[in-house]
Regions:
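Glycosyltransferase-associated regions of secretory-pathway enzymes
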Residues: 1-171, 189-267
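Residues at helix C-cap/C′ positions in short coil/turn segments immediately following an alpha-helix
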Residues: 104, 182-183
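Small-residue hinge/turn detector
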Residues: 172-182
Length: 267
């Protein structure tokens, strides 16, 4: 009887595994009745902060540190934080610090979607990061950020907020949009930089043997860089799927390179 139960359990696990593996680009898809993850809290995307000590707005009229074309490194934090305030852990701070140290002539931006004060546990980390003259920590308002871009009407329609992973897909949108608007480099908050990027242009990392990664990539202000950035933003808009986690991140840069290079094999 025990063996039968074990075999039944094993068979059930295999069936679940098969169901979870998509036949499209080997991307794991969402199975609604099996989704036990916490629903993304995205209320901060539309919330107006009344905090007097909240971080400065990016692209505000009072901003004196307008991004320099192509000389920027962007990190985005798209989580919404509660009453405890904005949080940044030591690993994330290490990623930002490494980018600033290895690229002293580039401006490193950490952009939060949630606007609030920093949590007590984060104050010391932030103070240390801001000791670097090329580090900027700002708040970004998605509704304003998409204005006068190919994504303005699309974002206003509310499609992204209906995603199964709105926070992750917001991050996908912002990384391509930041490079479209200003040029430069985007890095995930778990990427530690060990060398200079200052002479590296128009690049992306490898996700695996089939897909290009969206966690490390750069588009400069050259004709090629502008073409890549524009193609990625338009692919994101055209092929966005809220039910496929990786379709809007690595999927975008992979499809774009396949199209521009006229090949299925870009790795």
């Amino acid at each position: 009887m025990k063996k039968r139960l074990l075999w039944c359990g094993f068979a059930f696990a295999v069936v679940l595994l098969i169901l979870m593996i998509s036949t499209e680009s080997n991307i794991i898809q969402r199975i609604p009745f099996l989704d036990v993850t916490t629903v993304n809290d995205i209320r901060c995307y539309d919330k107006v902060s009344i905090a007097t000590k909240s971080i400065q707005d990016f692209e505000s009229e009072t901003s004196v540190d307008e991004p320099t074309s192509g000389r920027n490194i962007f990190f985005h934090e798209t989580s919404c934080f509660g009453e405890e305030g904005l949080m940044l852990n030591a690993r994330q701070a290490c990623a930002i610090e490494s980018a600033a140290r290895m690229n002293p002539s580039m401006t490193v931006y950490l952009l939060f979607v949630s606007k609030s004060e920093f949590s007590n546990s984060t104050h010391e980390i932030v103070r240390h990061l801001l000791s670097y003259p090329n580090v900027r920590i700002r708040h970004i308002d998605p509704q304003k950020y998409v204005k006068n871009t190919p994504l303005e009407t699309w974002y206003t329609s509310g499609v992204l907020k209906k995603s199964h992973w709105p926070s992750s897909h917001m991050s996908d949108m912002l990384r391509y949009l930041s490079l479209w608007k200003y040029g430069g480099i985007y890095l995930d908050l778990d990427v530690v930089v060990t060398t200079s990027f200052e002479n590296l242009t128009n690049f992306a990392g490898a996700e695996d043997w089939d897909d290009v990664a969206a966690g490390v990539m750069g588009f400069d202000m050259s004709k090629l860089g502008r073409r890549m950035a524009d193609a990625c933003v338009r692919d994101f808009k055209k092929n966005f799927r809220g039910d496929v986690w990786g379709n809007n991140g690595p999927g975008v840069i992979t499809r774009t390179l396949q199209k521009l290079c006229a090949t299925m094999y870009v790795i």
